[in-house]
């Protein structure tokens, strides 16, 4: 696993082998970042189910100003810390997604890009989308990137702007409804 573009291009990232988790494949990441490239510069990013931090690190490599990494697994938090040594704008916290969203709500931070890549079998995206909207965590022109396999995403708050399939995985990108 590596950073595929930007300032840290070619940087090897420490991976992981933990049941129920899997990193985003390089070809999916490359396509995704080609799609969202215009949203990245000087953005504030949330990588909510961060895993190794690969998506947030890619955003930082391509010009994001800050990234907040949350994961509930201490092993993964330690991997994120190792993978981000020497990088600026890093905020890493061990927390499940519910507590993470509550913390962010209280801090009044709004994000330009939010990555949601939870363990597929848990079907957490709909709950996350509801909370992101209700807690007002997304800037008006921000986007939410969802990666999943089988979850049926149903949101009244966000508009689908891009939908791609990569093998058995889907990437959907949403923005706020106007």
Give the role of each language-model region.
Residues 1-178:
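Class I S-adenosyl-L-methionine-dependent methyltransferase catalytic core
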């Amino acid at each position: 696993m590596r950073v595929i573009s930007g300032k840290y291009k070619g940087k090897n990232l420490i991976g992981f082998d933990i049941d129920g988790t899997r990193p985003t494949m390089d070809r999916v990441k490359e396509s995704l970042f080609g799609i969202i490239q215009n949203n990245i510069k000087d953005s504030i990013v949330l990588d909510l189910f961060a895993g190794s931090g690969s998506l947030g690190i890619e955003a930082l490599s391509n010009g994001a100003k800050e990234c907040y990494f949350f994961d509930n697994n201490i092993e993964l938090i330690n991997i994120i810390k190792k993978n981000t040594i020497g990088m600026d704008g890093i905020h890493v916290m061990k927390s499940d997604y519910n507590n993470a969203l509550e913390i962010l709500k209280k801090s009044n931070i709004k994000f330009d890009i939010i990555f949601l890549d939870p363990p597929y079998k848990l079907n957490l995206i709909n709950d996350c989308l509801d909370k992101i909207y209700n807690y007002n965590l997304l800037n008006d022109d921000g986007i939410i990137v969802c990666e999943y396999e089988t979850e049926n995403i149903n949101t009244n708050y966000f508009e689908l702007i891009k939908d791609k399939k990569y093998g058995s995985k889907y990437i959907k990108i949403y923005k706020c409804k106007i």
